[in-house]
Regions:
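Active-site phosphate/pyrophosphate-binding segments
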Residues: 15-132, 142, 170-274, 285
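Single conserved hydrophobic/aromatic residue that forms the stacking wall/gate
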Residues: 1-14, 18
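Hydrophobic/aromatic beta-strand patches that form the interior of the parallel beta-sheet core
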Residues: 15, 114-116, 132-136, 161-164, ...
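Conserved, well-ordered active-site substructure
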Residues: 283-317
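Phosphate/diphosphate-binding loops
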Residues: 139-154, 162-164
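Low-complexity, glycine/alanine/valine/leucine- and proline-rich hydrophobic stretches
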Residues: 165, 317-331
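Short, well-ordered secondary-structure micro-motifs within conserved domains or adaptor modules
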Residues: 124-140, 297-306
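C-terminal amphipathic alpha-helical interaction region
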Residues: 195, 200, 241-243, 279, ...
């Protein structure tokens, strides 16, 4: 029954006017939730209540979606275009969803908002003047540490919005709030939030690389940096307002992600730079649009595994490993075509050790004074 149901869902005629980042409250997102035995009626009730509040004609400060969208758009225009999502531990992955929504919707025409998810939280002095923090606080979670960190950010003058969630079902309300807010922010930035003009580029490059592989029997070999050279390259390109995007083509593991957190922490501490992280090829449909179409402030560190052991793809003349490397190379070439600085490092036999080697070599940067700005007041969810 489950197999039949899944097949029927897959065969559904999805509405072509719904962006992939807006599917969470459609059948695409709700059916998996139902299979997990979540209360769908309760989810939709929370989302519907938020929709009513966002659709009513009222002052911006009383409209949850318009308020967040106006804050994101106005602060981005003022130079605070790095929206850093903080969330209670049980809902920490919300930031990954918001990452795709914001990056895919706003990153175009050399404008956009850079979403930051699951970055280690540090002292306020470590952050530059390009940050805007949004804190999703879940009632009943262990929030003591995060509460203190957020309060420190507010005292230091960083703009912070806090949304209070009664329980996890309030995430449905947040989904609608953020979708509405993203459209508002896109309007303020003067871009069309419902298209993805640069997503296809990397796909086309990947196909060209694979065609070359099937003809020549090998993939092109881009210039590869050692961990030491990677750090030199990164350090030489970091400027005020930059962000470092770490793009990893490797098997996801907890140990590897812990190493990535150490690297992100080192970069923020030493260079006061924003960091993002994504696994390839997943990020191509998340932050990939922003990387190529958004502001030219990104510095890209591409980490590529040896892809062993490997598996052959049925009915194809290449393996999954070759496909992944072709996707990495295709995106690298697309980034370079847009004038983006890209540094590639081969992870080698021990990906964790390679990432740690980069983190240990991150150079300190001269300290600079932190600029204080006006605070953004707390906005509850209900």
């Amino acid at each position: 029954f489950k197999q039949k149901t899944a097949y029927e869902i897959y065969q559904c005629d999805w509405s072509s006017d719904v962006c992939s980042s807006d599917l969470v409250l459609s059948l695409f997102g709700l059916v998996p939730a139902a299979l997990l035995r979540l209360d769908i009626s309760r989810l939709l009730q929370r989302a519907g209540a938020m929709a009513v509040r966002c659709r009513e004609r009222r002052a911006i400060q009383d409209n949850p979606g318009a308020y967040l969208g106006t804050a994101m758009g106005a602060l981005a225009q003022a130079g605070r275009d790095k929206v850093t999502v903080l969330a209670s531990s049980p809902i920490d992955t919300f930031g990954l969803w918001a990452e795709q929504l914001l990056a895919e919707s706003t990153g175009k025409e050399t404008r956009g908002i850079v979403p930051v998810a699951q970055e280690p939280v540090l002292s306020p002095a470590q952050y530059g003047s390009d940050r805007f923090f949004v804190y999703l606080r879940l009632k009943g979670a262990n929030n003591q540490t995060l509460d203190r960190q957020v309060q420190a950010l507010v005292r230091a003058g960083h703009p912070v919005l806090t949304f209070a969630l009664r329980d996890r079902y309030d995430l449905a309300a947040e989904f609608f709030r953020w979708e509405y807010a993203t459209a508002v922010a896109g309007h303020l930035l003067g871009i069309q939030p419902f298209d993805q003009p640069n997503v296809q580029e990397s796909k086309d490059n990947t196909r060209r690389v694979l065609d070359g592989y099937q003809t020549a029997g090998r993939l092109p070999e881009p210039v590869v940096s050692s961990p030491k050279d990677a750090v030199v390259g990164l350090s030489g390109k970091v400027q005020v307002g930059s962000y470092v995007a770490i793009l990893a083509y490797t098997t996801p593991t907890k140990l590897f992600e812990a190493a990535i957190r150490r690297l992100r922490k080192a970069l923020v501490q030493q260079h006061h730079v924003t960091t993002t992280f994504g696994y390839g090829p997943r990020y191509l449909h998340s932050t990939g649009q922003l990387h190529k179409g958004g502001p030219a402030s990104g510095i890209f560190l591409e980490l590529v595994d040896r892809m062993t052991p490997d598996l052959t793809i049925p009915a194809q003349q290449f393996s999954f490993g070759v496909l992944a490397k072709a996707q990495a190379t295709g995106d690298l070439e697309s980034l370079q075509a847009h004038g983006r600085p890209v540094i590639r490092v081969t992870l080698g036999a021990d990906p964790v050790a390679t990432v740690d080697a980069i983190a240990h070599r991150v150079r300190p940067a001269p300290s600079r004074p932190h600029r204080r700005t006006a605070r953004v007041r707390r906005r509850p969810n209900s």
